[in-house]
């Protein structure tokens, strides 16, 4: 009885995951295709990351010597855990490689690697976003915090839109990345006073 209940719940969640994927993926247009392909391309964000690192060094000054290793470490660890641990261990095919669903998908950006659980894009972006939300001083830089959080959400959404991940891949990746970002920011705040802008 317990086994049957667990199987029913698993089947329900799996079906829900697939239906959400199809609903998001099928709500496409040429304009959205361009936006999502752009958002999902890691290379185009490198200049933004460079500017962000430069700004963090300017804003935190000496404390950046602690902040940068922590935030870079959180993102790198998020990427390693999702890419080298979860994906090969669980071996869950990306939707675009899954013969049970890929014929129904709109794939404007082709298909990436074979496995998709968990999403590295989601884990990396939320590790960075959550770190900044916590490490930046409370009550300040609200616009930046909102932009960073929206960026992480858009990047994660784009992975489902493009058929590269199931929603659960993205949700799980966001949780892992968020926890790592929270942990790194907590360490930073413990060893550093809240940032005060230099005049």
Model-identified regions with their sequence ranges:
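Short, aromatic-rich membrane-interface segments at the entry and exit
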Residues: 42-46, 64-69, 142-145, 167-168
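Hydrophobic alpha-helical transmembrane segments
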Residues: 40-60, 121-132
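Alpha-helical transmembrane segments of multi-pass integral membrane proteins
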Residues: 37-41, 70-71, 173
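Alpha-helical membrane-inserting segments
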Residues: 52, 77, 81-86, 180-188
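Interfacial segments of alpha-helical transmembrane regions
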Residues: 53-82, 145
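Membrane-embedded catalytic cores of phosphoryl/pyrophosphoryl-handling enzymes
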Residues: 106-199
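N-terminal transmembrane-helix/juxtamembrane module of multi-pass inner/ER membrane proteins
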Residues: 1-49, 82-113
């Amino acid at each position: 009885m317990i086994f049957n209940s667990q199987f029913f719940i698993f089947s329900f969640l799996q079906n829900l995951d697939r239906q959400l994927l199809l609903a998001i993926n099928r709500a496409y247009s040429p304009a959205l295709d361009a936006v999502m392909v752009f958002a999902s391309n890691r290379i185009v964000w490198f200049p933004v990351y460079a500017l962000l690192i430069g700004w963090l060094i300017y804003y935190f000054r000496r404390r950046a010597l602690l902040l940068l290793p922590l935030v870079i470490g959180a993102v790198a660890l998020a990427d390693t855990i999702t890419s080298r641990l979860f994906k090969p261990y669980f071996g869950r095919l990306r939707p675009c490689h899954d013969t049970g669903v890929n014929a129904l998908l709109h794939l404007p950006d082709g298909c990436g690697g074979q496995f998709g659980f968990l999403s590295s894009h989601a884990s990396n972006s939320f590790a960075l976003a959550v770190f900044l939300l916590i490490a930046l001083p409370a009550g300040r830089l609200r616009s930046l915090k909102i932009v960073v959080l929206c960026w992480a959400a858009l990047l994660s959404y784009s992975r489902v839109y493009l058929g590269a991940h199931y929603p659960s891949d993205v949700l799980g990746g966001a949780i892992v990345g968020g926890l790592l970002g929270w942990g790194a920011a907590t360490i930073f705040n413990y060893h550093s006073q809240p940032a005060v802008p230099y005049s």
